[in-house]
Design a protein with these regions (language model features):
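Terminal and linker regions of secretory-pathway proteins
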Residues: 2-508
């Protein structure tokens, strides 16, 4: 999840014609004010932007094209990736695009399981941002290899494709190698595109339709995944593939509740010492109340404006004091690795960008564009100006649970921006049919079956599980690769409670 710079926040507020926070927030007593403000603001009616392409290869003979049986305007381009050329993994791989006419093109890279690809589960992985490529997950966190300083792949023995086949989809439109005439600037639209991609994928790989299928991701995927799951389960009951479960790591799903937990995390109540002064903590605590009121207006309104202002205020009041400490927003234990101020924070992410811009890499994968960037600021800004970041998506998690579809919310406990306290809180307050039974469960130790070490804390009732992972930041697989792999292997094997399977986990 990217964060706003305070200067940008102030520019945003100035752009909506109010000279100070005080003047802006005096308007929030009555939600009807927003109806008039929408007309005054001159907010972008279409924040989507055109992407300049370096080249097109729709007619590349190395691609096989599958036309959708649902809608002939959609197709899937597919090419085999020679494992020996890039050395990311020795397993079978495919890459390509989902195309909608000539206006939308979504890039993906698919790796078979290292174990039993015919029968092992399929996992779709999504990174966040909004606007960040899922190749961050592939080449920095949980994929078959990472990229070293010498631009050569480093084998990852803890890759999630040890026991599952992995799809890495670059979405929404405009991210990474994905491109189009217009860019998507809302989670709702992104969810529709992702669902259509999945239908096409399983048309191209029909032998995998009966396999377990999971959607996993982190950060802003806490928005994406609930929306995609809603598209699958509720809006498309005639789907041709299974949805077995979803997994969200350090996500932003219920911003109203999660915003209340920035001050506790920064001020020593999340298992780490305070990083702000008592005066700053008191000021942040007061600001949290105003943030809560703004988020409530966002939740209640059909207008984007209250959500835009809620994002601007909450980020400036609850993120900026922390950012000013110089600490990494993704890991409270220290500053960014290279003392960067651009939000990248990890040198390895720069290696991924450099690697993906090598002509031989792009040629092997069949990318239509040359200018790869791990995070796209235009996409991020587009989502900002629809207020998408402050909108709620936890209701779709409840929907899944009420359909008895398992949900795992996991969180590294050293992250600040989507911290474990906030994720634990919203999952505890979620309105679903077994809320009270879930609430009565207490966090208990999660102990490794491999080493006997306590890796974190877990809480489970029925299909719903919350998992705190010790000593991991925003990107759990990066900080705790062994624990991350044990987590995903346990989950996809059906051990939703992360316990001795002889334990009666669902007793009320």
């Amino acid at each position: 999840m990217k964060y706003l710079n305070l200067v940008f926040v102030l520019q945003l507020l100035i752009s909506i014609k109010y000279a100070s926070f005080g003047r802006a927030f005096s308007l929030f007593e009555d939600d009807t004010t927003f109806a008039n403000l929408d007309k005054q603001l001159k907010l972008p009616q279409n924040t989507q932007q055109t992407l300049k392409l370096d080249r097109l290869n729709h007619d590349d003979p190395l691609f096989t094209t599958f036309i959708s049986s649902m809608d002939k305007d959609y197709s899937l381009r597919l090419r085999t990736v020679d494992p020996s050329k890039l050395g990311i993994d020795t397993v079978k791989q495919w890459s390509g695009y989902m195309d909608y006419k000539d206006s939308k093109h979504f890039f993906y890279w698919f790796f078979e399981s290292r174990n039993d690809p015919a029968d092992d589960p399929i996992i779709l992985w999504l990174n966040g941002g909004p606007g960040c490529s899922s190749f961050t997950g592939l080449l920095f966190e949980l994929g078959p290899s990472s990229i070293g300083a010498d631009m050569k792949p480093i084998h990852n023995p803890y890759s999630w494709n040890n026991n599952a086949s992995m799809i890495f989809l670059e979405q929404p439109l405009g991210v990474g190698f994905s491109y189009g005439d217009e860019k998507v600037s809302s989670t709702k639209l992104a969810g529709k595109d992702a669902y259509i991609f999945l239908e096409l994928f399983f048309e191209a790989f029909p032998h995998l339709r009966s396999n377990d299928f999971h959607i996993a991701g982190e950060s802003y995927a806490g928005h994406y995944i609930p929306q995609i799951a809603h598209e699958i389960v509720v809006k498309n009951p005639e789907r041709t593939f299974n949805l077995t479960s979803v997994m969200i790591g350090n996500g932003i799903t219920d911003p109203l509740i999660q915003a209340d937990y920035y001050e506790p995390m920064a001020c020593g109540k999340g298992g780490y010492h305070p990083v702000l002064s008592s005066e700053e903590c008191e000021k942040m605590s007061k600001a949290a109340g105003r943030c809560r009121r703004l988020n409530k207006l966002c939740y209640a309104s059909k207008s984007s404006l209250p959500c835009i202002v809620a994002t601007a205020y909450c980020d400036s009041a609850l993120l900026e004091p922390y950012i000013n400490t110089g600490l990494n927003v993704y890991d409270i234990r220290g500053p960014c690795e290279d003392n960067s101020t651009d939000g990248m924070c990890y040198t390895g992410l720069r290696y991924v960008d450099q690697y993906m811009n090598f002509p031989e890499v792009q040629e092997t994968l069949g990318s239509d564009v040359h200018n790869y960037s791990g995070c796209d600021n235009d996409v991020f800004t587009g989502f900002l100006f629809t207020g998408d970041g402050s909108k709620p998506f936890q209701q779709y998690i409840a929907e899944l649970l009420n359909h008895n579809i398992p949900v795992l919310i996991y969180a590294g406990d050293k992250d600040y921006i989507c911290n474990w306290l906030g994720n634990h809180a919203w999952s505890n307050e979620l309105e679903w049919i077994n809320k009270r039974r879930y609430q009565r469960r207490m966090l208990r130790p999660w102990v490794s079956k491999e080493t006997g070490e306590e890796l974190g804390q877990v809480k489970n009732y029925g299909p719903f599980t919350f998992l705190r992972i010790y000593d991991a930041g925003h990107m759990v697989p990066y900080d705790q690769p062994e624990a991350s792999l044990e987590m995903v292997n346990s989950w996809i094997s059906g051990n939703r409670a992360f316990s001795d399977l002889s334990t009666l986990e669902n007793a009320s």
